[in-house]
Amino acid sequence: MASLHRPVLIAAMAAAALTAAACHREGAQPAADSHAEHAPSTPKLGDFGFDAAGMDRSVAPGDDFFGYASGNWVRTTQIPEDRSSFNSFVSIAIETERHSRDIIEGAAANDRVTGEDKQIGDYYAAYMDEASIETKGVRPVQPELEAIAQLGDKQALARTLGGQLRADVDLLNATNFYTDRLFGLWVSQDLHHPGRYAPYLVQGGLGMPERSFYLDGGRMADLREAYRAHIVKVLELAGIADAAARAERIVALETAMARVHATPERTNNVQAGANAWKQADFAHNAPGLEWALFFDAAGLKAQQDFIVWQPEAVRGLSALVQSEPLQTWKDYLSFRALDRASPYLSKSFADERFAFYGTTLEGTPQQRQRWKRGIDATNAALGEAVGKRYVQKYVSAQTKTRAEEMVKNLVTAFGRRIDALEWMTPETKQHAKAKIAGLTVAVGYPDSWRDYSALEVRRDDALGNVERAQLFEYRRNLAKLGKAVDHREWYMLPQEVNALNVPLENRLIFPAAILQPPFFDPAADDAVNYGAIGAVIGHEISHSFDNMGALFDEHGELHNWWTPQDLKKFEAAGNALAAQFSAYKPFDDLSVNGKLTLGENIADVAGLATAYDAYQLSLQGKQPQTIDGFSPDQRFFLGFAQAWRGKYRDAALRNAVLTDVHAPGRFRAQTVRNVDAWYPAFDVKPEQQLYLAPEQRVKIW
């Protein structure tokens, strides 16, 4: 999919539960001038921007390039007790978190602030007011529980389910498919009509990450028992009687949902998801749920056109609304309300939620400190308001300009690679060149900021703030319907450590936070920067031409621009890369899913090759010197490999392999084996483990 990296599972699920809030951009303020004008003059890592001490030179690079580049770092680095993994993204996120804390706590401590500063401060202060939250106990969620208890028929159930719909998934940008509500909504450019927005309806309703957690044996059976116990505990904390019997019904209902859910591979298939339905089609195509009542309560009564991403799942979930007893649905909705609210209720609820989702599912020993969770919550609700202040204080204009120059070099290099393709016909090349020519790029931060002035934030209402933020974001998305597509919208925050390809708009976004070591250091050697952030930029460019991006034309319309023979060759190369990654086994009983991760792997291979070409172009015929015994090419590939260094707890790694469209970092680092220049750089021999014969090296772009 389109983002460079997905946070670990529990963070991704938390993000789904707390969606960023914003309103219209009319009257949005221009981007503030950066106050952080001066970039450092010396590299943060080592003498030239690379952590040579993190290497393990006893490992042959041709046998395990990840181990060679980062083996000592892996041995000596401890995963923080409050994390399920640690990697380059997390190391930058920790630094960025400190910056966000300075901004947010400063606003909370100043009783004279107004406007967005007051909203930021009040939101955080409400979350941090543990004494008030403890005193309230379960009371903040009681009105919702009482409303659920009063449901008298399936018509009322349909209205409740519709009223709970939120804009809490993102199919093609952030690769977030998870929602614990029965359905998720994504409002984005229409696959078939690029000039307008469409609402995408997505499967949901599960408390655990995806269907295999309910249907598979072995470890999954143990997790189901732990989940059942978690449900019992949450219901008991709320004082709900017959908790064990209710938990049995809830697990049985969610298991039935899991049976009709699409697999991750199917969900990742954009062609299978491009199902245009009229509102009138739902009653016939997915009988069971009273759809007219559902859409009315969801504020979508007048909306006629939808895209249904998993029609079989929508059909199955709708049928369950009709077939399962009303009381079972009431039990389920009561638990969902409590579980969703738990982080904002008293300590016993928050601790129980972490015990299951953090420790049992992810293996994380310790819950993050409350201030860290408060920073996350505030960023989720008021992200661009915090981001504007982050940019003013911490983002160097010099860094932004340097990154923009690198992007231009990478785009030029990719265009030349298209010209040089021997297997592609001129007809297909013409379309590919049009797409690269139409690519637009945003670096650092948006040109205008969202206006949060209409969002109500109360200093004494932590849960209410979250719910109002979610509803506010939902209404912001609904307001897009019927309007022209806004190609200025950012789908990531400046303080977010990630990068993004927006396939429906043929656009790239590089937030400011990723422009930090080890990905980018303005004082580092160019070879290292091109290997690290250059490969990231190349990765995002290449997403426009991966197995999903290649389905879209230069206008973001889903339409086949390939000749049959070219498409056949492209798919054959993709199959070879999928087989290559499926051979990687992080556990004896679990392999990487090469098909699920194919889009990311194509982007890694093409992105690395493009970054190498761009680096060579940047030299303008000059030959850089050897530094500390490393040639320029060696520094380039080592910069790439160290950017992907990381460690997982076993439970988190298993979950990532099952659910993430990105392969684990250690295998992404081995992408080098598909690039010809890597072999002479490290004198890789045919008998070494990573060696691929020239005809086996995957070269798609």
Model-derived segments and spans:
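Hydrophobic/aromatic-rich, well-ordered segments within soluble, folded domains that form packed cores
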Residues: 55-75, 214-235, 598, 605-610
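C-terminal motif of bacterial Sec signal peptides marking the signal peptidase cleavage site
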Residues: 19-22
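Post-signal peptide N-terminal segment of mature Sec-exported envelope proteins
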Residues: 29-45
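Noncatalytic, helix-rich "gating/capping" subdomain that lines the substrate-entry/channel surface
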Residues: 106-409
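Bacterial N-terminal signal peptides that target proteins for export
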Residues: 1-11
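Bacterial signal peptide processing site
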Residues: 24-26
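Active-site-surrounding "flap" and adjacent substrate/cofactor-binding loops of secreted or lumenal enzymes
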Residues: 41-46, 59-135
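Intrinsically disordered, low-complexity linker/terminal regions across diverse proteins
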Residues: 39, 43, 256, 280, ...
